[in-house]
């Protein structure tokens, strides 16, 4: 327990909460341009070819983003929107590409959870 005299000498320091998505700079999303689109393998014990892209944001920072869903149309120089959200089995990937925004198309033939993948309602 701290005494009053100890607190007079130096006040309690305020804990600084570190952001898990520093490149967004407190914004919900940020726009960027794809520099490189490639696949990478996840950590053990998982096995796959995860689709990721390197993005240069409007604030000048460069980040790695995960492209969710089955199939994508992203190429170099494509303008995309990114949001926060890490991918647990890909080290260094802390951002997701927003599907269905700017140059990134939504997932084709998606029936459930369409809002997460930028897919319009199917006309029946």
UniProtKB/Swiss-Prot annotation:
A cellular-component GO term for this protein: small ribosomal subunit
Disulphide connectivity of cysteines: none
Q: Name one GO biological process term.
A: translation
Question: Which key words are in the record?
Answer: Methylation, Ribonucleoprotein, Ribosomal protein, RNA-binding, rRNA-binding, tRNA-binding
Answer yes or no on keyword Ribonucleoprotein. Answer: yes
Q: Does the keyword Chaperone apply?
A: no
Kindly give the SUPFAM superfamilies that the UniProt entry links to this protein: Nucleic acid-binding proteins
Residue positions, PTM 3-methylthioaspartic acid: 89
Q: Which CDD domains match?
A: Ribosomal_S12 (cd03368)
GO MF annotations in UniProt: rRNA binding; structural constituent of ribosome; tRNA binding
Question: Record's Pfam families?
Answer: Ribosom_S12_S23
**Which family does the similarity line name?**
Belongs to the universal ribosomal protein uS12 family.
What does the subunit section of this Swiss-Prot or TrEMBL entry state?
Part of the 30S ribosomal subunit. Contacts proteins S8 and S17. May interact with IF1 in the 30S initiation complex.
User: In UniProt terms, what function does this protein have?
Assistant: With S4 and S5 plays an important role in translational accuracy.
Q: What is this protein called?
A: Small ribosomal subunit protein uS12
Q: Which organism is it from?
A: Blochmanniella floridana
């Amino acid at each position: 327990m701290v005494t009053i005299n100890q607190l007079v000498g130096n006040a309690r320091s305020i804990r600084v909460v570190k952001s898990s998505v520093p490149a967004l700079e407190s914004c919900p999303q940020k726009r960027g341009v794809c520099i490189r689109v490639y696949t990478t393998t996840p950590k053990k014990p998982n096995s796959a070819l995860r689709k990721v892209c390197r993005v240069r944001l409007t604030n000048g920072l460069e980040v790695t983003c995960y492209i969710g869903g089955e199939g994508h149309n992203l190429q170099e120089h494509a303008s995309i929107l990114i949001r926060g959200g890490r991918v647990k089995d890909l080290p260094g990937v802390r951002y997701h590409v927003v599907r269905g925004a700017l140059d990134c198309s939504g997932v084709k033939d998606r029936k459930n959870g369409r809002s997460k993948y930028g897919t319009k309602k199917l006309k029946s």
